[in-house]
Amino acid sequence: MGIAGELVELGIKLVVLDVQSDFIHCSDNIFLKEKHHIYKPIPDDKLNIISCKESRNFLEKLGINGEIIYTPGHSHDSISIILDEGIAIVGDLDPIDNVLAYNENNILRNSWNKILSYNLKVVFYGHANERDVSFYALSNTFDMN
C-alpha cells in the first residue's frame, strides 16, 4: 500500500488527471490505521495534475500516440488510455463482456460507449485477460437494451 507515495519520495514524477485529484487522499485514513503496513500518503505539492484535454500533448512528449479519457464505472476517478494504434488500457473498468450484468448502470455503459467510439482492436484490463473488441468497435456502441 502507498507505493505511489514511496515512488514520489524516490524522485519519480507522479502525473494525475484532473478528474482524479479529488480522490487522491480518500483512503489515507484507512491505510494509516493499518499498523502492519507502511503507508506513505502522497504529498500534494508533488502532484503533477493535467487535464484529459492536455493528455494527448503530454503523451506525445513521451513518444506515445494516444490520449487519456475519463471513464467512470469501476470508480468515480477511473480513466482509460486510448492508443492511436487501436489499443485501450482500461484498468479496473468492468470487462465489456460483463456489462450486461449491470443493465441499470448507465455510467458504465456510457464509459464503454466512449471507449468504443475509438477505432479499437484490443482492450487490456487490470485484472482480466486482454479482449479483442473489434466486433463491438464496428458498431461504435455498446447498447445494453
What is each stretch, according to the model?
Residues 30-31, 65-144:
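Metallo-beta-lactamase
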